[in-house]
C-alpha cells in the first residue's frame, strides 16, 4: 500500500487517451493502439515522452513495464512486485494486469503483440525514445513477424497533455511559488551580498548553493511563503540545475549551464525552476548593477514586450501569432533589438518541462486552448554596452522568464511575485572615487599578502582572505548573540520584578493541611465474627485493618495507622512488634511528609509487641500485614499519580457520513501492550483509534485536549508518525500518558530480495535499483499520506490545533532520559518523537536555559531548562556534543530564550527552593544573573557528566522532584514496570532506626 494510484484520475485520463485515438487521428499518426513501454531505469532525463505519459496516467514511473491502450482494452505487463500496486485499477473490466514471469516473458509479450494486432496494424509509440532491458527485447522479438507498423505519437501526446485539470494546475502553482521564493528570498540576497562585499564565488558554486537550499525544510516557513496546507517538501524537486550567468558570457537557451567563472557585478541573469509532484515551473530575472541609461531603456522595452506577449496569449490564438506580435512590438519600439530577440519565446510546460511540439515561435501553427500553461521566456541575447569601461560589461543579455496559465478571461501569471519593474532589479553601489580608493586598498592588501606567502607558501592569499572573513563573521555573530542575550536577560529580570512585585514570602504560600481520614468499621457489629473467636491477631483484608487483642477485646487498627514492624524468633516463641503512627514522629524517609492528625492531643498507641507460640500463624499474620501495607502504599501512589487525570468529554461521532480514516497505523502507548495495526478516525470533536482485535479497545483524543500536534516525516527515520501532546493526561489501559502517537513503519521487508532464488538467474543490480526506487516511493507516499491526514485533523478542529513539523537540520543529540537521541526544534517546541519515552518541551513555558560543563577539554556539555512555573522541576538534557554548542546557542537566541553558561553542574534542587521561597527577593537581588558568575561557593561537582545509565534524573533532585507531575517532559509512564511503595526491608530499617536498634543483616 506504499504506492497509491488515483483510480479516478487514471480512468479519466485513459478514457481521454482512447478518445483522442479517434478525434486526433492525424496527431496520433493513425495509430489503432498506443504502447508505452519503459525498460530498465538509469536514464537521467526525466522528460522522456513515454515516461511523461506514463507519469501522467499513473502518477508514478514504473520501470520494466508495458502499457498497451486500445479503444476497448487497457493492459499492463509488469513483474509481480509492481502488479500489486496496479491491482486497484482492475475494478474496471477494461483494465487487465498481466504478470511477467521471473524467468522471462516471451509468451506474455507475444500475447500482448497479438492484442495490439487485433486492434489494428498501426501501433503508436514515441519513436525517438529508446529503452533497453529484457522486456523491451522480448516485445521487439514478438513484433518482428507480426506485420504491425510503428507510428510516432509524440504530437498526439503533446495535444493530450496540453490542457491541465484542477489538480495539475494546483501543482504547477505550488511549484511556481517555490521557484519564485528561491529566486527572491535566497538568490537575490546572496547575490547582492557577494557583489557588495566583492567576494569571489563561481557561477557553478553559487548554483550548487541554490540547489542545496531545497533540503532546507524550514526555508518556506521562515520566509512566510504560503504553499498550501497539504504541501510537502519531499514532493519538490529541481527541474534543472539553476542557471547563473554574468561577466559578458550569456546563453539564454534552457539547456545552458552555469560555468566556473566568478560572479561579476554587472548584468546578472538567473533562471531556475522547480517541479512539484512532477509538474514543472520556471522563472528567470535579470539584475543590473550600476546600469547605463541605454541598458535601462532596453530593459524597459523588454518589460513592455512581456505585457504585449501576455495580451497575445489567448484561447484560440496560434503560437506563431504570439511570436509575430512580439516581433511587431519590437519593430515599433526598438527596431535595433529585433536581431537580438530569441527565436523561441516560450513553450508548453507541465509534467513535461519543454514540449518540443508546442513552441512559441514563427513556425508553430498550434492553437492555444483553455487550461494550458506556458513558460514564457523573453530575452535579448548579446547586446553591446558601448559606454562600459569594464571589459566584462561590454556584452550583456536581458531575460524575463515566467510561468503562466491560460484561461478564457486571459493570462494568469503564476510567478507574478518575482520582481519585474526596473527599480526592483537595478542596484547602485559606489562611484569612481570609491573605486579608486578601494583599488588602492587592494594594492596595499596585496603587498601584505605577498609577505605572508613567504612565511607560509602553501596558503594562498584567497584562502587567507576567506578565513579572515569567516573569522570576522564569526566574531560579529558572537557579539550580536551576546548583545541579544544581554537584552533578553534584562527583559527577563524586569518581567520577574513586575510579576512578583506584590508577592511576599514563599511562592506556593501556605500549603493546605490535608488530614487523612480513614475508618475500619462504623459499628462494632461489623467486625468479622469468624476472626473474633480465639482473640488472636488477625488481618481483615476487606476493611484494610489489623485486629489486635488488647485487654481481652478485639481492637481494629486501619492499615494507614501502621508504620512499620519486625518479627523475631526466640526459642519456642515468636515476637511481633508493630509500630504505629503518632504525632511528633520524624518521617522515616525524606520523601515522606510527617502525618497530620485531626486531634494531636488525643491518646495514641505508638507501638505494641505480641509474643506467641503459634509460629506458623504469626508468620502468616506478619506476611499478611506486610502485603496489605504494600498494597495500600501502592494504591495511594497510584491515586496520587492519577490526581491530574481529568475526565474527558464524550467523543461526538460523525453520523451523516463515514469518518475520515487512516488505516494500518500503530499506536504508542499500545492498549494492553499489544502492537497491533488499527484505524485512526476523525470525528466531530476529536480522534478515535480503533483496534481490530477488540472493539472495546478504543483511544479517544479530543481536540480541546491537544496541546501540540506534530507530523514527523520519514527523512532519516524508520517511521512516519502523527503525534499528539496533550494538555491533560489520559488513561490508556491502566497507565497515564501525556502523549499519544500514531505511526507506520517506513521500510518494508517485503522488498528485500537479497539472497533469494532470484540471485541464481540475475547477475545485475536491477533488483537493487528497483528495491531502492520502491523504498523511495514508499517513503514519499507515506509522508504525503500522513501529512495530508494531519492537515485534515487541523481542519476538522477548526484550526484549534495546528500541525507542527520538527526541523531536522536544527536538531542536536543529547540524553534527556537514558538514551542518546536526536532532539529537534519545531516552531513551538523542542521534541524527540521517535524513541520512548518521548520528549516534548514547550518553548513558551521556558524561563531560561543554562549550559553546564562548558569548559575547555570536555567533549560534552549539558543543557538545563528552567520553567516559568518555578514549582516544576527543571529539565536536563545531558551529554550534548560540544561541537554543537554554537548551534544550540544560535537556536536559543533565535527563539528568544535567554541562556547562561557555566563550567560545572549546579544543584538545581537547592536553587529552585531558594527561588520559590521568596521570588520577589530573588529578582530584587539580581535574579538569574548569578548563573554567569564564576563562584566556588556553590555545592557543585566537577565530573564528566551527571548522566548515569541507572538514573533518570540527577540524584540531588530526587527528593525535590517526585512531588511534581512532569508534563512537557513526557516521561512515558507506559514503559515503566516499577512497583510503587516501599519494600519491607526498608520499612524494617525505619522501625529499627526509631527503636535505636541497628538493622539486622540479611543472611
From Swiss-Prot:
Looking at the UniProt record for this protein, which Gene Ontology cellular component terms does it annotate, in alphabetical order? FACT complex
Q: Bias category Basic residues: which stretches? A: 440-450
Known CDD domains for this protein? CDC68-like (cd01091)
Where composition is biased (Acidic residues), the residues are 933-986
The entry's localization annotation reads: Nucleus; Chromosome
Q: Where is this region: Disordered?
A: 436-486, 930-1003
Classify the source by domain of life: Eukaryota
The free-text function statement in the UniProt record for this protein reads: Component of the FACT complex, a general chromatin factor that acts to reorganize nucleosomes. The FACT complex is involved in multiple processes that require DNA as a template such as mRNA elongation, DNA replication and DNA repair. During transcription elongation the FACT complex acts as a histone chaperone that both destabilizes and restores nucleosomal structure.
For this entry, the protein name equals: FACT complex subunit SPT16
State the organism of origin.
Yarrowia lipolytica (strain CLIB 122 / E 150)
Amino acid at each position: 500500500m506504499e504506492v497509491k494510484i488515483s483510480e479516478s484520475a487514471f480512468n479519466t485520463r485513459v478514457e481521454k487517451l482512447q478518445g483522442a485515438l479517434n478525434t486526433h487521428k492525424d496527431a496520433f499518426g493513425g495509430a489503432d493502439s498506443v504502447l508505452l513501454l519503459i525498460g530498465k531505469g538509469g536514464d537521467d532525463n526525466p522528460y522522456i515522452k513515454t515516461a511523461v505519459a506514463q507519469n501522467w496516467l499513473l502518477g508514478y514511473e514504473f520501470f520494466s513495464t508495458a502499457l498497451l491502450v486500445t479503444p476497448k482494452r487497457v493492459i499492463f505487463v509488469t513483474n509481480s512486485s509492481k502488479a500489486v500496486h496496479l491491482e486497484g485499477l482492475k475494478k474496471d473490466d477494461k483494465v487487465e494486469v498481466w504478470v511477467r514471469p521471473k524467468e522471462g516473458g516471451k509468451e506474455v509479450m507475444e500475447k500482448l503483440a497479438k492484442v495490439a494486432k487485433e486492434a489494428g496494424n498501426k501501433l503508436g509509440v514515441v519513436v525517438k525514445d529508446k529503452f533497453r532491458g529484457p522486456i523491451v527485447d522480448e516485445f521487439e522479438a514478438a513484433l518482428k513477424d507480426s506485420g504491425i507498423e510503428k507510428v510516432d505519437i509524440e504530437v498526439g501526446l503533446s495535444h493530450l497533455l496540453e490542457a491541465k485539470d484542477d489538480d495539475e494546475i494546483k501543482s504547477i502553482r505550488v511549484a511556481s511559488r517555490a521557484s519564485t521564493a528561491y529566486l527572491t528570498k535566497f538568490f537575490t540576497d546572496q547575490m547582492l551580498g557577494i557583489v557588495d562585499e566583492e567576494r569571489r564565488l563561481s557561477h557553478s558554486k553559487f548554483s550548487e548553493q541554490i540547489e542545496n537550499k531545497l533540503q532546507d525544510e524550514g526555508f518556506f516557513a521562515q520566509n512566510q511563503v504560503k504553499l498550501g496546507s497539504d504541501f510537502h517538501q519531499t514532493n519538490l524537486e529541481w527541474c534543472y540545475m539553476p542557471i547563473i550567468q554574468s561577466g559578458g558570457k550569456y546563453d539564454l537557451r534552457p539547456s545552458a549551464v552555469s560555468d566556473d567563472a566568478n560572479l561579476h557585478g554587472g548584468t546578472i541573469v538567473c533562471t531556475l525552476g522547480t517541479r512539484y509532484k512532477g509538474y514543472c515551473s520556471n522563472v528567470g530575472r535579470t539584475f543590473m548593477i550600476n546600469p547605463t541609461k541605454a541598458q535601462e531603456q532596453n530593459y524597459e522595452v523588454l518589460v513592455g514586450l512581456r505585457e504585449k506577449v501576455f495580451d497575445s496569449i489567448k484561447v484560440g490564438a496560434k503560437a506563431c501569432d504570439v511570436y509575430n506580435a512580439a516581433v511587431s512590438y519590437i519593430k515599433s519600439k526598438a527596431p535595433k533589438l529585433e536581431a537580438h530577440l530569441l527565436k523561441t519565446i516560450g513553450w508548453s510546460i507541465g509534467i513535461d518541462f519543454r514540449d518540443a511540439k508546442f513552441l512559441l515561435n514563427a513556425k508553430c501553427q498550434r492553437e492555444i486552448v483553455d487550461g494550458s500553461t506556458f513558460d514564457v521566456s523573453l530575452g535579448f541575447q548579446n547586446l553591446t554596452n558601448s559606454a562600459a569601461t569594464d571589459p566584462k560589461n561590454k556584452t550583456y543579455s536581458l531575460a524575463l522568464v515566467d510561468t503562466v496559465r491560460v484561461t478564457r478571461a486571459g493570462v494568469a501569471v503564476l510567478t507574478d511575485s518575482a520582481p519585474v519593474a526596473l527599480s526592483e532589479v537595478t542596484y547602485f553601489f559606489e562611484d569612481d572615487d570609491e573605486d579608486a580608493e578601494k583599488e588602492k586598498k587592494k594594492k596595499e592588501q596585496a603587498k601584505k599578502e605577498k609577505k605572508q606567502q613567504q612565511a607560509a607558501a602553501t596558503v594562498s592569499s584567497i584562502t587567507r582572505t576567506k578565513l579572515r572573513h569567516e573569522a570576522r563573521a564569526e566574531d560579529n555573530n558572537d557579539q550580536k548573540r551576546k548583545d541579544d542575550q544581554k537584552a533578553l536577560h534584562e527583559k527577563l529580570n524586569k518581567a520577574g520584578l513586575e510579576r512578583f512585585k506584590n508577592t511576599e514570602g514563599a511562592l506556593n504560600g501556605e500549603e493546605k493541611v490535608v488530614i487523612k481520614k480513614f475508618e475500619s468499621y462504623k459499628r462494632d457489629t461489623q467486625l468479622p465474627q469468624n476472626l473474633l473467636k480465639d482473640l488472636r491477631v488477625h488481618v481483615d483484608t476487606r476493611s484494610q485493618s489489623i485486629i489486635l487483642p488488647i485487654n481481652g477485646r478485639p481492637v481494629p487498627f486501619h492499615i494507614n495507622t501502621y508504620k512499620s514492624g519486625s518479627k523475631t524468633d526466640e526459642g519456642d516463641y515468636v515476637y511481633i512488634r508493630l509500630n504505629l503512627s503518632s504525632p511528633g514522629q520524624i518521617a522515616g524517609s525524606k520523601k515522606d511528609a510527617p502525618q497530620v492528625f485531626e486531634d494531636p492531643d488525643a491518646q495514641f498507641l505508638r507501638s505494641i509487641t505480641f509474643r506467641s507460640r503459634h509460629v506458623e500463624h504469626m508468620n502468616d499474620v506478619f506476611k499478611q500485614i506486610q502485603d496489605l501495607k504494600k498494597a495500600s502504599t501502592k494504591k495511594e501512589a497510584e491515586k496520587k499519580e492519577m490526581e491530574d487525570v481529568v475526565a474527558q468529554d464524550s467523543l461526538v461521532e460523525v453520523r451523516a457520513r463515514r469518518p475520515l480514516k487512516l488505516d494500518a497505523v500503530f499506536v504508542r502507548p499500545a492498549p494492553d501492550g499489544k502492537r497491533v495495526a488499527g484505524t485512526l478516525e476523525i470525528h466531530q470533536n476529536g480522534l478515535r483509534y480503533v483496534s481490530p482485535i477488540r472493539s472495546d479497545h478504543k483511544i479517544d483524543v479530543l481536540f480541546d485536549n491537544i496541546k501540540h500536534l506534530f507530523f514527523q516525516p520519514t527523512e532519516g527515520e524508520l517511521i512516519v508518525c502523527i503525534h499528539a501532546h496533550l494538555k491533560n493526561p489520559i488513561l490508556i489501559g491502566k497507565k497515564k500518558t501525556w502523549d499519544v502517537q500514531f505511526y507506520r513503519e517506513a521500510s518494508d521487508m517485503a522488498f528485500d530480495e537479497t539472497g533469494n532464488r532470484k540471485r541464481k538467474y540475475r547477475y545485475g543490480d536491477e533488483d537493487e535499483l528497483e528495491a531502492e526506487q520502491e523504498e523511495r516511493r514508499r517513503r514519499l507516499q507515506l509522508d504525503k499520506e500522513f501529512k495530508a491526514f494531519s492537515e485534515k485533523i487541523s481542519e476538522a478542529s477548526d484550526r484549534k490545533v495546528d500541525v507542527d513539523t520538527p526541523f531536522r537540520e536544527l536538531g542536536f543529540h543529547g540524553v534527556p532520559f537514558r538514551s542518546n537521541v536526536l532532539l529537534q526544534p519545531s516552531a513551538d517546541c523542542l521534541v524527540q518523537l521517535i524513541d520512548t519515552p518521548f520528549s516534548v518541551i514547550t518553548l513558551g513555558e521556558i524561563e531560561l536555559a543554562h549550559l553546564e560543563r562548558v569548559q575547555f577539554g570536555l567533549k560534552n556539555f549539558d543543557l538545563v531548562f528552567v520553567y516559568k512555573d518555578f514549582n516544576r522541576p527543571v529539565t536536563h538534557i545531558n551529554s550534548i556534543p560540544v561541537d554543537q554548542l554554537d548551534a544550540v546557542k544560535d537556536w536559543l537566541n533565535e527563539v528568544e530564550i535567554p541562556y547562561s553558561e557555566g563550567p560545572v553542574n549546579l544543584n538545581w534542587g537547592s536553587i529552585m527552593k531558594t527561588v520559590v521561597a521568596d521570588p520577589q527577593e530573588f529578582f530584587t537581588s539580581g535574579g538569574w544573573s548569578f548563573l554567569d558568575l564564576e563562584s566556588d561557593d556553590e555545592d557543585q561537582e566537577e565530573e564528566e557528566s551527571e548522566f548515569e545509565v541507572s538514573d533518570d534524573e540527577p540524584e540531588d533532585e530526587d527528593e525535590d522532584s517526585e512531588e511534581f507531575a512532569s508534563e512537557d517532559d513526557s516521561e512515558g509512564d507506559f514503559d515503566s514496570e516499577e512497583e510503587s511503595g516501599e519494600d519491607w526491608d526498608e520499612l524494617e530499617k525505619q522501625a529499627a532506626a526509631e527503636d535505636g536498634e541497628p538493622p539486622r543483616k540479611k543472611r
